[in-house]
Amino acid sequence: MDMNGKAAIVTGGASGLGAAAARMLANKGAKVAILDLNEDLGETVAKELDGYFVTCDVTNEQSVQEGLEAATNVHDCARILVNCAGIGNAARMVGKNGAHDFGLFSKIITVNLIGTFNVTRLFAVSTTQLDPLEDDERGVIIMTASVAAFDGQIGQAAYSASKGGIHSMTLPIAREFANRGVRVCTIAPGVLKTPLLDILPEEVQKSLGESIPFPQRLGHAEEFASLAMHILENRYLNGETIRLDGALRMAAK
């Protein structure tokens, strides 16, 4: 898909992977709307991109519906969706204080998996009805999983389950939307340098980078964004989860 002039939605676009994707979309000429809970950062990124920001809770149907409608009123109906909203708390099944907190497990599943599903289904209602472009393509949906979906570590039961769910629903959604001209792909990042990782001590970040086979460093958010752009531009990519991890296979802990 040629992104120039196309409307795009990026959830979690106020920082990290989402912000990098939003910036690269804007550089390609897309009209970007950021949906995020962080108003200060979201407004800042949107202003930088001459885009649009909407405060949005991806787990709430009304919030997402209103966010998509607001973005449509400003930029027209979007053909591009990049789902980056998510959280990543770690906890053991049985820790020092007893069993894994059930509320924490539910929250991670709700934000990461159900939130992605919620935005995707509501986005698709209008996008599947747009006029087709080249190859009868109407839109592209990109979701964000994690290598934890495949080799989760101790303490990642909830996170791995949430990201594994995103991976598992990629193909069924792509198959459903095939006759409507909407492609669906998922990116499964490894250890990328994001604000969440920046809070770790420098020596820990260095050690993490050295654990990557090649290139032996942390990944960059811009590399995630670059892969997202390739997915958008390559019309034969569909129904696939792509690992972006420098050949990393995570150890148990």
In which residue ranges do the predicted regions lie?
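Canonical Rossmann dinucleotide-binding motif of NAD(H)/NADP(H)-dependent dehydrogenases/reductases
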Residues: 2-33
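Catalytic Tyr-X3-Lys loop
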Residues: 87, 98-118, 142, 159, ...
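Conserved mid-core segment of classical short-chain dehydrogenase/reductases
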Residues: 88-106, 125, 129-135, 155-158, ...
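Active-site helix of classical SDR
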Residues: 120, 162, 170
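Alpha-helical segment proximal to the catalytic Tyr-Lys
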Residues: 125, 174-176
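Residue(s) in the substrate-gating loop at a strand-loop-helix junction
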Residues: 146
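Short, small/polar-rich loop/turn modules that mediate ligand/substrate recognition or access, typified
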Residues: 178, 183, 237-240
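C-terminal substrate-recognition "lid" of short-chain dehydrogenase/reductases
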Residues: 220-244, 249
